[in-house]
Swiss-Prot record:
GO BP terms in the entry: translation
PANTHER family in UniProt: LARGE RIBOSOMAL SUBUNIT PROTEIN BL19M (PTHR15680:SF9), RIBOSOMAL PROTEIN L19 (PTHR15680)
Name under which the protein is recorded: Large ribosomal subunit protein bL19
One cellular component term from this protein's GO annotations in UniProt: cytosolic large ribosomal subunit
Name of the gene encoding the protein in the UniProt record: rplS
Length: 127
């Protein structure tokens, strides 16, 4: 392991975050910490992951797209941000691309993603 990869691994271990295994096409729920004045709360942002950049390293990020009141809204989250409270995979999608930018031009049924039928979360598989 080279020096940079070793430093990244140390930083990831120091953060102690549990990032689930997800990829483009998966529907995920991101619990994001929002500060309003003096109060802080967790706001859930649920949508389809349309891209992941820079892998699972410390500089990695992912883009989540959702339709809010008829408008498409995309948000880019750094993977190891301190503002991210939790990431949960709601459902697995079956796609054949790594970047799903073509969903931006689609509306309605054509923007749907097929669900992986035989997906079982790791907690259920062990039980």
């Amino acid at each position: 392991m080279d020096l940079i990869a070793q430093l990244e691994a140390e930083q990831i271990a120091a953060l102690g975050k549990d990032i689930p295994d997800f990829k483009a096409g998966d529907t995920i729920r991101v619990g994001y910490k929002v500060t309003e004045g003096t109060r802080s709360r967790v706001q859930n942002y649920e949508g389809v992951c349309i891209s992941r950049k820079n892998g699972s390293g410390i500089a990695g990020s992912f883009t989540v797209r959702k339709i809010s009141f008829g408008e498409g809204v995309e948000r880019v989250f750094p993977l190891y941000s301190t503002n991210i409270d939790s990431i949960t995979v709601v459902r697995r999608g079956r796609v054949r691309r790594a970047k799903l930018y073509y969903l931006r031009a689609r509306r309605g049924k054509s923007a749907r993603i097929a669900e992986v039928a035989n997906y079982k979360p790791k907690a259920d598989a062990e039980a």
